[in-house]
Regions:
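Short beta-strand-initiation
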Residues: 7-9, 128
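Short, low-complexity Ser/Thr-rich regulatory SLiMs
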Residues: 3, 14-16, 135-137
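A long amphipathic alpha-helix within ATP-dependent nucleotide-binding catalytic cores
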Residues: 45-139, 195-203
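Conserved ATP-binding module of the ATP-grasp superfamily
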Residues: 1-7, 20-22, 27-52, 56
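Beta-strand scaffold of nucleotide-dependent catalytic cores
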Residues: 11-25, 34, 69, 73-78, ...
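C-terminal active-site "lid" helix and adjoining low-complexity regulatory extension at the edge
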Residues: 100-110, 122, 126, 135-209
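Low-complexity, flexible helical/coil segments
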Residues: 35-41, 48-62, 163-172, 180-188
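Intrinsically disordered, low-complexity acidic/polar segments
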Residues: 10, 21-22, 31, 140, ...
Length: 209
């Protein structure tokens, strides 16, 4: 049996020792306007999701689990939420199930960022990964790790629903090339503007690995 952890789920994406982003994952929900039913609001939200190249693959499907979740909160698909009233459709923060992504990198404390880097650095030979954390606040003094993924889904940081985007592929490719060029002392090197910063970050990371 697993212990229940109070808080919200965050994915920390680390590539070659660089913390690219911290993304909060939130369950699917709709926001009322005082006119449309939950079912109609889901259809409206799905049209919005189609405008995103990533989210359009994952519409909010009205499943039996969503109906059961609404029923457990004394609601149904026919309920008309008040203006600005937010209604959760599930307790699961899964993008495939209609969840959303918020880039909270700039809001999270440096201690949490260092914690994520230290956790990944504690695994020998692992320089890139996706850490699933549970936080109670943006400056939680005791964050919890619930999962470590050796193959991070970098698209999560590229296409957040809210907040600034990032370019994880650029970070990964350029940091690998910078490392390769310094290790092999190549004459005709590919110019990377942030090469020194990539190498410095990786060396700091490796000291803890």
């Amino acid at each position: 049996m697993q212990n229940f952890l109070k808080g919200f789920e965050v994915r920390a994406t680390i590539l070659q020792g660089t913390l690219v982003a911290l993304i909060a994952r939130i369950p699917p929900y709709v926001e009322g306007n005082g006119r449309n039913t939950i079912q109609e609001l889901i259809a409206i939200k799905n049209r919005t999701r189609k405008s995103c190249g990533y989210l359009k693959k994952y519409p909010i499907n009205i499943t039996s689990k969503i109906k059961e979740f609404l029923k457990s909160n004394n609601l149904s698909l026919d309920y008309i939420p008040k203006n600005n009233e937010r209604v959760l459709l599930s307790s699961v923060s899964n993008i495939a199930g209609g969840g959303e992504l918020i880039n909270i990198t700039d809001k999270v404390s440096d201690n949490i960022k260092e914690f994520a880097l230290d956790v990944l650095a504690s695994i020998p030979g692992l320089y890139s990964g996706g850490l699933d954390l549970v936080l109670r606040s943006f400056d939680d003094p005791e964050p919890h790790v619930i999962e470590i993924n050796t193959f991070p889904v970098i698209s999560l940081t590229k296409y957040p629903t809210y907040g600034k985007t990032s370019n994880p592929a650029k970070v990964l490719v350029e940091s690998v090339i910078a490392q390769h060029q310094i290790n092999n002392n190549e004459d005709n090197q590919y110019y990377i503007e942030n090469a020194d910063e990539y190498l410095k970050t990786l060396l700091i990371f490796l000291k803890d690995n």
